[in-house]
Structure formats: structure tokens, C-alpha cells
């Protein structure tokens, strides 16, 4: 959210494939998990659109909570910088891929997470969701 000339990251999540299909889209069988903004670690279990919660990735067996997202500081930096390139949008969701050489933008979304993230309280430790975070910045839009 770009509010009063300052770029603020409201939330971040990782999307992951959850089937034999090589896609991470929530609407195509994928799942997601929130990322701790300070540490860049996966904050809790993942959830799919059917509201099934996964402590471990079903294909790899990797424990999700606590997994460190590579290049996290760089991810945050490029998203904050990019928000200033399109200040007229105010609220943008940045899709970022993590490659072996660092983060790369995939796309920007003007309606990010509108169909998936209402589920977030299901697996979030506080069971609250992200509305309180949005409320801090919405006045500046």
C-alpha cells in the first residue's frame, strides 16, 4: 500500500503447487501460506481453496512453518521501490518469483488476493486475518 508517499507491505504469502500440475495458482489446486514480514519465514501451515490445512508440503514433505524464503530482504526492497513507480494505484499486489539468481517480478495486480486471502484466518496463529493491518493504511488512500 502506498500511503502518504510511503510504501508499506501489508502482507506476503507464498503460493505453492499441490498436485501433479506445475502451477501454484490457488484456483488450480495450489495452496498458500503467509510469510512473516520481518523474518521472511513461512509463518504457519498452508491452506488450499477447499480450506484444507497442510503442516507439510504434500509432495516434498517439507515442514512449511519456519521455512526461510531466499532473498527476502531483496524481495521487500524491490516491491517497495516498484510501488513508487505507479503511485496512482495505491494498493498493488506484486507476484515475485524466487530464482537461483534472486527475485524477479512476474506481474502486478490491482486486486490482489481477493479470492484467496479471506481464508487466511483459518491457519493464522491469531485467527484474526489481515483487516487490522489494512486499517492502518487505508485512510491515506
Regions inferred by a protein language model and the residue ranges of each:
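Residue-level preference for alpha-helix termini and adjacent loops
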Residues: 15, 34, 41, 66, ...
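Phosphate-binding site of ATP-dependent enzymes
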Residues: 1-48
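Short, surface-exposed charged micro-motifs
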Residues: 93-95
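C-terminal active-site "lid" helix and adjoining low-complexity regulatory extension at the edge
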Residues: 55-74, 80, 84-89, 98-141
Amino acid at each position: 500500500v502506498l500511503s502518504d508517499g510511503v510504501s508499506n507491505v501489508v502482507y506476503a504469502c507464498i503460493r505453492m503447487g499441490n498436485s501433479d500440475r506445475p502451477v501454484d495458482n490457488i484456483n488450480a489446486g495450489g495452496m498458500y501460506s503467509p510469510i512473516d514480514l520481518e523474518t521472511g519465514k513461512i509463518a504457519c501451515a498452508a491452506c488450499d481453496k477447499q480450506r484444507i490445512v497442510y503442516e507439510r508440503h504434500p509432495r516434498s514433505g517439507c515442514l512449511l512453518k519456519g521455512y526461510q524464503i531466499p532473498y527476502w530482504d531483496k524481495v521487500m526492497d524491490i516491491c517497495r521501490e516498484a510501488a513508487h513507480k505507479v503511485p496512482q494505484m495505491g494498493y498493488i499486489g506484486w507476484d515475485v518469483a524466487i530464482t537461483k539468481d534472486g527475485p524477479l517480478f512476474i506481474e502486478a495486480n490491482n486486486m490482489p488476493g481477493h479470492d484467496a486471502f479471506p481464508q487466511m484466518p483459518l491457519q493464522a496463529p491469531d485467527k484474526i486475518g489481515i483487516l487490522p493491518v489494512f486499517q492502518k493504511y487505508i485512510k491515506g488512500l
